Amino acid sequence: MLQGVSDLSIKQLLLGVNNVGSVHLSDIPSTRARNFLRGTDPTSFKQTCRALEKIKNSCTESDFKKALLFVRSSSLFDGTEIGQLFIDRCPNESNELDVKYSLSEILRYINQFADELIVLSDCAAKIIKHIDKGNYGTALDYCSNLADMKGTSVFLIRQLSYITNRYQLLELDDSEILRKIDYMKQRISLSRSSFLEGAVTQLSNLRTSYIATSKRIQDIKEDFQGKEIAKSFVQPIPSNLHEFESVLSDYFSFSLFDAFLYIAKFQSFSLQYLPSNQLDVDLFLSYKKISSIKFSPEKMYKTVDEDAGYYYFRESFLFNEQKGALRFQSIHGYYYYDAFRSNLKNLIQKQLVNDYFSNVNSLEQLKYTNSDNYVVKSEKYDSTTCGMLENSTALIHLLERKQGKLDTREQELFVELMSYTRDVGEVCPKEILATISSIAQCFRLKLVVNCLITINNKTQVSEHQLRSTIQDYCIEKFGGDLNLLIQHLYDISPAVAEHLLLTCDEKFLATLFRIVDRPVDAIKVRADMLYWYGKISSEERYLDRAKMLKIDIQINKEKGTIDDSRIYVDPFKYTQWFEDQMVGKLTMAIDNLLISEHAVVNPNWKHMGVGTTGDVIELLLACYKEFCDNKSFGIASYLGRRIRHGTFEGTASTELKALYTNEEYKHLFEDKEFATKFDEWLNQYELMISELKKNALQIKSKRKPSGCFSTDIDTPQKKIVADQLIFEILRIYSKRSGVIRLPSVIIDYCWRLVELDLTATKKLLSEKKSSHGVFSYTPKFGSSSYKRQYSKFSQEVNSLTSQKFGLMASWFNKPNYASPSTDIYLLFNAVISEVKDSFRDFEPKIDQGQRSFTINGGTYYVIYDALFVLIHNAARHGKSDGKMNFFVSIPEDRTNAIRLQLFTELDSIDSVDKALSNIEEALLNTQGDADEFDNKSGMKKLKKLENEGSISELQFYSKPEENMLCFDFHFELDSRGKYDDLDS
């Protein structure tokens, strides 16, 4: 490595920092605290953490600070993962030793170790210098040198990420660079600080959503080392002294070098709340060596085009010691940060924004077309050279100044600007967009703005407005032809046309009832739109999707308003889980695979840690396991609520048992030999059904080894599908929309994997039908007429088992989500029919007239579940031929909910009172697994639906004069619930 005489000298000096003069054990006033440290093995991270936690909990804050500083400055504890003021390896962030230091406390240490910091700064400047020149191998040598001198820091992590990005974006072909990157990650034990590593990687990854990643970081509530550092990557300029000290303290907890760089950066930036000239002159001059080097976008990217400003913005926190980078990030980040923290205004950044856009006063001054010359500027907005990012923030700046009140000409310009802006729907305040929509003088603008509103504000009201606008515009101008509407918008703005195309998926189109007559028509319209757009844009993925939809139209018959393929995984909740828990880990693993020294894709699904694809495989297996095993939105939730809670057994056996009392066959059971044989057959049949329910129709696990649904890639057919998933992910990942498409691609392939188990499940049901579902009896004596009666009975039994097993097999078809909309009264009728399959005597007197109430979206499964619980209980405990009334209405004080009321008749007032008592008892005990409460799990489920937000205002009461039991609840139109253990 590159080490000069001064470097070696400072290395030796830093190895013995404790001798320079810092906190000594005797400086800690508390005898108790000193004794805790004396009894600690300084090489043990756990013991040292435990001792410091005891001091934190039993001594004063001052004692704890001094004890922690003693550990961080003493050479005795140099090997522990807690870290030191100067470190050669990253500290372990998994500790609860977070403590806040003041600016004055940290400055004291910076001035005390000024000489050491100056030499580290000189080495850091060499790293920056060689990066700027494109000498990445030499820069990595100096990175190693910095670590050897105990200069491991967040600064070093940022530079490693920057070099990694250059390798990918510039498409370098140098295995030595990859080897050095891998070596440095191991050298500094980067995995100890996995949260910071992930934050740096994901924020600067140009394929991931910047807003989603930033929001996840800003929404972190718990305190831990590194949290404030990560937040400073998103919000680089602190609003006040308290915020500044909070971030500074977190940097100080990582390394003294990082704390020095943070103070120096803002001494150079001249924040009003910070005293000037806090640092020694020589220290500040050493910092200037780092900050004076300016990275040029021309060197950073292969081409400088309309997206270069956005790319530069995404990466600027990696090198924001450079004043221009800090300024550029602060100006444009102001609007991105404001998108999810609108209640917090940073006045310092606001002043920078006003200065940057001071030369812009009207929409006519913005950019409307591509150009040949692009320059990323941090001083002033320039429409002649700006890219899409700068043009977008300029537009939002003007919209805020005008409060969304645009004149006729500006309304036309707003639509045209959609072809040269980005992220407007996510970043522009929704109030501004709502104002523009309310004053829009033409359908075109209203359509564009309502599309933008639904991007970041998907409520029942906003989607209704968008549907209404699309239908009004389409009917008035294009005779109801959506394809002509898309083509017209494409001539105005390809970006708007593409956005509308993505909005108008099959589910959305099925709700355009004025121009799409039937749900199946939505598939055809969607296919036509995708085909046209694929042709005009030369995008094969749109053409492929169009072909698949047209095939679906041919092979799938219209199933009515309710999909009878009952198995279901909620794609919304799964995507939410994926974005919260998996997207960061998976993108980092894919990046590591793509830049690894031996990037060979060799999937091994049984030994995840083998080969370079091991991390990716492990994470994809976790995605598949969640898809199957999650008890709220996965396959397991369906198996729990639909198979194991009564439907399966009732459907399989109820009508067979009814044959005992059937007038046509009742006399046959007077034959004891026949009755005994049928009893034995039915007993074996029911044992088989019970075995299926308890052991086969389960997620396979150690407890359920015979489960039909495996979360492993355990068959050759599954391996083929899983291998295709990896190659598909790698294929789309390099594209701009790759990361956004990951959830839908993974869901699609998860269904392909599950479909193999579904096929095996249906095969198993068929085998069980053949082995246990066939009854035959021929009496030894009697006339031909007499024997024909037994033969007819056997045919009746076998016909019933064939019918029921065919029905149950259909429950394990891969679902078609093309039309998730239905009339709630039809939904009610479907539940009645299903419950009748389990209770043959259940014939309620229903009077619902010609009422109808249409609801769209996959959420009607919640209504289905709630009604099933209530009607199933009514059939079991109520009057089998009693009155039943069902009403749907909109509450007067609510716009985002519907009210559902169910009235069921019981045999007597005593039965009503008993039912009320049983319900109250059931609702008192809503803890535990639903399987443990066979008779009460229904009421428990209703309570859980209420607790997780899918329904509300759940209440029950009686009408004594009519012997009626009444259930009343609200269904929340805006809620998809939380992904907790809802259906356990």
From Swiss-Prot:
Record has ATP-binding as a keyword: yes
Keyword GTP-binding: no
GO molecular function: ATP binding; kinase activity
Phosphohistidine modification, residue list: 645
EC number: 2.7.13.3
UniProt keyword annotations, A-Z: Antiviral defense, ATP-binding, Kinase, Nucleotide-binding, Phosphoprotein, Transferase, Two-component regulatory system
Catalytic activity: ATP + protein L-histidine = ADP + protein N-phospho-L-histidine
Biological process, per Gene Ontology: defense response to virus; phosphorelay signal transduction system
Post-translational modification: Autophosphorylated.
Entry function: Sensor-kinase member of the two-component regulatory system Detocs that confers resistance to bacteriophage. When the system (DtcA-DtcB-DtcC) is expressed in a susceptible E.coli (strain MG1655) it confers resistance to bacteriophages T2, T4, T5, T6 and SECphi27. Detocs inhibits T5 infection leading to growth arrest but not complete cell lysis, during SECphi27 infection leads to cell lysis.
Protein name (record): Detocs histidine-protein kinase DtcA
Organism of derivation: Vibrio alginolyticus
Biological classification of the source: Bacteria, Pseudomonadati, Pseudomonadota, Gammaproteobacteria, Vibrionales
